[in-house]
Amino acid sequence: MSRYRGPRLKKIRRLGALPGLTSKGTRPGSDLRNQFRSGKRSQYRIRLEEKQKLRFHYGLTERQLLRYVHIAGKAKGSTGQVLLQLLEMRLDNILFRLGMAPTIPGARQLVNHRHILVNGRIVDIPSYRCKPRDIITTKDKQRSKVLIQNNMDSSTREELPKHLTLDSFQHKGLVNQIIDSKWVGLKINELLVVEYYSRQT
């Protein structure tokens, strides 16, 4: 299944706020309507919608998300918590959380077009897994700097998560540590996502 490229508002009306997909929010009252509908949903649909929230927020294909679930299942600790850590530490998501890109698809485009360096080297793989002490900078080209600066100027990001530090003047971000689950950028029940996949096998 390919990455979603359809209408974004349609998705957030059904699934709720997906800040990684679009900076636009849901309409007033939509959360109440979703809660009203939730009484009529089957357990399968509830798990499916949580999975879809995760997939669309992080901009993943079905195959990519399934691969992350398998990796998380083999790691120590809670599968759901590890899954969120893996997704949050992707380079495209880190750029988004730093405010260097308006959305995760926007961050992915920056990486694909080779505007971003990690530890002084160009990285053009959006799924690159960032590690503690990684330094993320903009390529030393005027176009790259202007793109990032424009994104940062228009950013509506709230408090920066504790695992990141941003030097906005130098367009530089630092990964301090692996993200703590309470700083994940999406309201999600990750256990339902794990249950969804466990019931597919």
From Swiss-Prot:
It comes from the Eukaryota. Residues 89-150 form the S4 RNA-binding domain. Gene3D superfamilies: Ribosomal Protein S4 Delta 41, Chain A, domain 1 (1.10.1050.10), RNA-binding S4 domain (3.10.290.10). One of its GO terms (biological process) is ribosomal small subunit biogenesis. GO terms for molecular function: rRNA binding; structural constituent of ribosome. It is found in: Plastid, Chloroplast. Its main location: plastid. SUPFAM superfamilies: Alpha-L RNA-binding motif. The keyword Transmembrane helix does not apply. The keyword Ribonucleoprotein applies. One of its GO terms (cellular component) is small ribosomal subunit. Belongs to the universal ribosomal protein uS4 family. PANTHER family: 30S 40S RIBOSOMAL PROTEIN, SMALL RIBOSOMAL SUBUNIT PROTEIN US4M. Part of the 30S ribosomal subunit. Contacts protein S5. The interaction surface between S4 and S5 is involved in control of translational fidelity. This is Small ribosomal subunit protein uS4c.
